[in-house]
Amino acid sequence: MIAEALAAQKEGWRYTPAAALTGPDFKPAGVPESILPLGGRVLCPVGFHRAALVNGRWEAKHAVLKLPDGVTVEPFSSASGLGDLPNKPAPADMPLAQAASAARDGFVVRVARHARADRPIHLVHISEASSAAESSAARVIVVLEPGATAELVEETLSFGDAPSWKNVRAQVVLGEGAFLRHHRIVREGAQGRLTLGLEVTLASRARYESHALNFGGLFAREDLRVRIEGEGAECALNGLALLGGSEFADHHSVVEHVAVGGTTRQLYKAVIDDKARFVFDGLISVRPGAQKTDAQVYNKNLLLSEDARVNTNPEFKILADDVSCKHGGAVGQMSLEALFYLQSRGIGADEARRLLVYAFGSEMVDRVALEPLKLALADALHGRMPEENF
């Protein structure tokens, strides 16, 4: 069924190796024999509110939720008032999100009108693979009512030597004047696969700030849909992928401006080494009547080997005449002039290369305003620097 659905998406999956998902004989993930503590496993083990899914199931042992009034985090399987939550079917061109819609568990986050989450909310997705290939699905629903504010950190992890696949459908709804800062951190293992379908809707003057950071995994694909429905809404989409070996990452995004005066700023960077591959497809659609739209989409890529590959396609579809829209894509190798400059200052060749790679990636880490997370991401960035003689 999955193979047929992906085969029908010829254009959107043209550069994506679907065999990573259809090749293994995935079985539904079971309950692990033991639940290991999160300490030392998550990237940022600080005093955030926290909830976790293990193999697609809410794990009460990992929940640390002393939430203020007006803020709730519940398991999808037993959340109250599900009938009031978003229930639109997933878009037709997101077949994996359609499949994940049938998931039995996940996270439901709600922030009431003018309420504020006092600390970031950390949602952890963990795959504990057994000796066989296993898959899990999950739902994530985040609703901020008018004037609400929250910071969300989602982290995906996989452990074990067997193939694992997490398939997640997420829906974010921001009411008038609401603000969500949404961090998504991918730290999959050598056999970890992640597919995410994320739909975001913004009402008037709502603000959505996204940071998507990929620190590795065999396969990751994110399909992001943002719909700016209210006047004056703002959307900032930041991303960084650090890939090596035979890793693959694919970022597909569509931002649809429907209302007057919306703003989008998108910048996604990737560092690709060895035989890794990266795909970026970023479309901004400006609908009729969405005058005064101010939108930009850029993708910048740094190749560290002759075998690394990038496919990039930032684009616009504009059906309004009073707009400001800019886009660009770049693929390049390390600057020989910059290398020569650093070496002329007494820095060794390998260290000079690592400094340049770090400088390229650190721009996206520096955009993270949450200080404990920024420090943890900087350490993770150091850990993903190329080895000597690259």
Q: What is each residue range found by the language model?
A:
Residues M1-N87:
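Long, low-complexity, mixed-charge
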Residues R50, A60-K61, K66-T72, S78-I347, ...:
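Conserved beta-strand/loop scaffold segments within soluble protein domains that form the structured core
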